[in-house]
């Protein structure tokens, strides 16, 4: 169910933003893994393909560094009400890091066990806006700083996974993974800092609200996988990840539907209520893929995958821990397909070049469809394999001002431009 949404970061507490557990190798191959025997990440993508390449034990550590940039701009009109340009009034750039890893153990012939710790849902989103006033001509400083608007969301839901694979026939493998989901240090902060009252601010006085959101209990999410290898050249994989319900307590920022855009939005109550609760039902995800070993003089592999999620089954309900009544948000999300493809070409025996791309539909509509490009390589040194991968993409959409000025009624929607890149390094050691 984790999709390569990869953007729309403002909606990070409504949609899972992490594209799932991937090593640098599978990330550089277009976030593949359904039909490719790649190691520990098969615990997540397709447990039927768990393998240690005939080694007894493989241990993998994965580090990532993600850069995110968001620019918001409002349209500038001429006397004929035509848009002359879009004036960028806030630009946020942040770097985030993460660590994941696990191991694959060969129990006996054609039977493998995988253990991993990975990020299931990353809630991180940071927004900082400097608000300036507008004074008449002749004033030395015509645009003094009047205040700041801030949003900070942090924390994640971590997946502790255990998976197994077994060969049932000579060409068919089956696998199962139990993903135990646990929330870790989730925070939600919303602030308006007023240095001096001004109509350009969203409030005439400062206020800050912070809540430490908790995931109610632990949730188990199963993944089922099957693979079929008709010959040495082709391998076909299928995976199914079951839908789950997640309940969050101590919620202050309440999701809602933005009336103008019909996109997700947020309501920030003026009074703190520690009994707020949000329950999100995430739909199941189905994936199918094929890996082909090309008949080239140099070793070459190609992968192609389709992923399907029926986001119309997504549900979000709000309520209180003090009573059983709940209110359901009807977001009217749409089903979405993803296409993942990649090529691994060895120029030298141990040094590959990898390239891939991802096309993702969005449950939010055509405006949010986007393409991501991936690149990578690797080097083998003895029993250790060092992999490097990078993924990058961008997105543009229209939305309201999230901190509207008190004096102005915003008529035109703003343009939000997002760009992101993620660099991953993997080290795998075989015993």
Residue ranges and their predicted role:
Residues 1-3:
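Sec-dependent N-terminal signal peptides
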Residues 8-28, 96-431:
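Outer-membrane beta-barrel porins/channels
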Residues 5-121:
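N-terminal, post-signal peptide beta-strand-biased segments of exported outer-membrane/organellar beta-barrel
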């Amino acid at each position: 169910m984790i999709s390569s949404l990869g953007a729309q970061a403002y909606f990070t507490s409504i949609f899972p933003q992490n594209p799932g557990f991937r090593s640098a190798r599978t990330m550089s191959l277009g976030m593949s893994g359904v039909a490719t025997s790649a190691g520990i990440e098969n615990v997540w993508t397709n447990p039927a393909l768990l393998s240690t390449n005939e080694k007894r034990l493989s241990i993998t550590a994965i580090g990532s560094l993600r850069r995110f940039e968001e620019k918001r701009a409002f349209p500038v009109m001429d006397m004929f009400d035509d848009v002359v340009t879009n004036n960028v009034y806030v630009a946020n750039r942040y770097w985030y890091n993460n660590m994941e890893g696990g191991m694959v153990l060969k129990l006996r012939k054609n039977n493998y066990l995988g253990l991993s710790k990975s990020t299931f849902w990353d809630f991180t989103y940071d927004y900082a806006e400097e608000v300036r006033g507008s004074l008449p001509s002749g004033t030395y400083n015509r645009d003094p700083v009047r205040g700041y608007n801030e949003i900070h969301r942090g924390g994640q839901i971590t997946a502790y996974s255990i998976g197994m694979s077994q060969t049932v026939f000579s060409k068919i493998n089956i696998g199962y993974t139990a993903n135990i989901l646990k929330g870790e240090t989730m925070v939600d902060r919303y602030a308006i800092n007023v240095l001096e009252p001004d109509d350009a601010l969203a409030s005439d006085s400062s206020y800050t609200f912070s809540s430490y959101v908790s995931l109610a209990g632990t949730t188990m999410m199963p993944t089922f996988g099957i693979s079929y290898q008709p010959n040495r050249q082709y391998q076909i994989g299928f995976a199914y990840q079951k839908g789950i319900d997640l309940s969050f307590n101590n919620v202050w920022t309440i999701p809602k539907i933005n009336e103008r855009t019909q996109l997700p939005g947020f309501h920030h109550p003026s009074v703190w209520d520690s009994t707020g609760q949000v329950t999100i039902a995430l739909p199941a995800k189905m994936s199918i893929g094929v890996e082909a070993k090309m008949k080239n003089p140099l070793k070459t592999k190609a992968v192609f995958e389709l992923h399907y999620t029926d986001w119309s089954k997504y549900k979000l309900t709000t309520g209180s821990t003090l009573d059983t009544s709940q209110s359901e948000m009807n977001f009217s999300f749409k089903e979405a397909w993803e296409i993942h493809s990649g090529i691994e070409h060895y120029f030298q025996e141990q040094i590959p070049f990898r390239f891939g791309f991802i096309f993702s539909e969005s449950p939010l509509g055509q405006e949010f469809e986007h393409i991501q490009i991936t690149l990578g390589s690797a080097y083998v040194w003895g029993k250790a394999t060092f992999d490097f991968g990078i993924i990058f993409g961008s997105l543009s959409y229209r939305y309201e001002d999230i901190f509207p000025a008190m004096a102005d009624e915003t008529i035109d929607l703003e343009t939000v431009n997002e760009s992101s890149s993620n660099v991953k390094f993997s080290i795998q050691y075989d015993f």
